[in-house]
């Protein structure tokens, strides 16, 4: 059931019920608060502050009604210098859904982008279809309404969470988020290179009016690879 709890943001961890009772992990990651979200959550350690929510991992369960309480709990913990672990039974669906809702609130990112970033370090993260639909319904408008409530209660959000989350995205995903100028330059260079390749690679008369799939693959590989390598080398 995974290889231990996963750090999503400074002060925010995602895991399963084994992680939540592992004193070595809890101590190493300095966990001070735990959200237990499964069928029968029970507090285990006296030195940790718990939020217990009884929720089954079934698509029809209205998990989004717990978003506000969980978001406030996590945010208060982080602002006070604590570390919060959000866990369910397997650390796959329920806990991931709660973490996504929090990250959406403090960053303004969409749930799919947040999930992609989480999967980069925790591939098993996978909300069930019903929870995904509820995250979609939560959306930008509701998450930003909740953000305003956080700021009214706690003040301006001091974290650089969006930057931290984007750093988790796969390199090629970040390549696609380049500036419009870079994209335009790449398009121009791509067209020129494709023309060169087409002149170098002979084609039969039958193919003279059809694009070559091989050339498309070569173009995609050679124009993404240098950018990814340069980003990776710059770390």
From Swiss-Prot:
GO terms for molecular function: protein serine/threonine phosphatase activity; protein tyrosine phosphatase activity; protein tyrosine/serine/threonine phosphatase activity. Its EC number is 3.1.3.16, 3.1.3.48. It is a lipid-anchor. It comes from the Eukaryota. It is found in: Cell membrane. The active site is at 88 (phosphocysteine intermediate). Isoform 1 is expressed in testis; predominantly in developing spermatocytes (at protein level). Isoform 2 is highly expressed in testis. Expressed in spinal cord and specifically in oligodendroglial cells. Expressed in embryonic brain cortex; down-regulated in mice with experimental autoimmune encephalomyelitis (EAE). Pfam families: DSPc. GO terms for cellular component: cytosol; plasma membrane. Keywords: Cell membrane, Hydrolase, Lipoprotein, Membrane, Myristate, Protein phosphatase. Induction: Down-regulated by nerve injury. Residues 4-144 form the Tyrosine-protein phosphatase domain. Residues 183-193 have a biased composition (Low complexity). PROSITE patterns: TYR_PHOSPHATASE_1, TYR_PHOSPHATASE_2, TYR_PHOSPHATASE_DUAL. It catalyses: O-phospho-L-tyrosyl-[protein] + H2O = L-tyrosyl-[protein] + phosphate; O-phospho-L-seryl-[protein] + H2O = L-seryl-[protein] + phosphate; O-phospho-L-threonyl-[protein] + H2O = L-threonyl-[protein] + phosphate. Residues 183-212 are annotated as: Disordered. It is an enzyme of class 3 (hydrolase). InterPro entries: Dual-sp_phosphatase_cat-dom, Prot-tyrosine_phosphatase-like, Tyr_Pase_AS, Tyr_Pase_dom, TYR_PHOSPHATASE_DUAL_dom. Belongs to the protein-tyrosine phosphatase family. Non-receptor class dual specificity subfamily. This is Dual specificity protein phosphatase 15. It comes from Mus musculus.
């Amino acid at each position: 059931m995974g290889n231990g709890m996963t750090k999503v943001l400074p002060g925010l961890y995602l895991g399963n019920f084994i992680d939540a009772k592992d004193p070595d992990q809890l101590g190493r990651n300095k966990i001070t608060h735990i959200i237990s979200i499964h069928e029968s959550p029970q507090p285990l350690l006296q030195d940790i502050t718990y939020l217990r929510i009884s929720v089954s991992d079934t698509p029809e369960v209205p998990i989004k009604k717990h978003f506000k309480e969980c978001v406030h709990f996590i945010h208060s913990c982080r602002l006070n210098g604590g570390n919060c672990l959000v866990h369910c039974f397997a650390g796959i669906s329920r806990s991931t859904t709660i973490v996504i809702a929090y990250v959406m609130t403090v960053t303004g990112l969409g749930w799919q982008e947040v999930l992609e970033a989480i999967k980069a370090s925790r591939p098993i993260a996978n909300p069930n279809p019903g929870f995904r639909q509820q995250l979609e319904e939560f959306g930008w408008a509701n998450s930003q309404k909740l953000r305003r409530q956080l700021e009214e209660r706690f003040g301006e959000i001091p974290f650089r969470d969006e930057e931290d989350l984007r750093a988790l995205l796969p390199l090629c995903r970040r390549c696609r988020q380049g500036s419009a100028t870079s994209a335009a330059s790449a398009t121009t260079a791509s067209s020129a290179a494709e023309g060169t390749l087409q002149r170098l690679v002979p084609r039969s008369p039958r193919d003279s009016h059809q694009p070559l799939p091989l050339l498309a693959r070569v173009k995609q590989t050679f124009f993404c690879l240098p950018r990814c390598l340069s980003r990776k080398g710059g770390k």
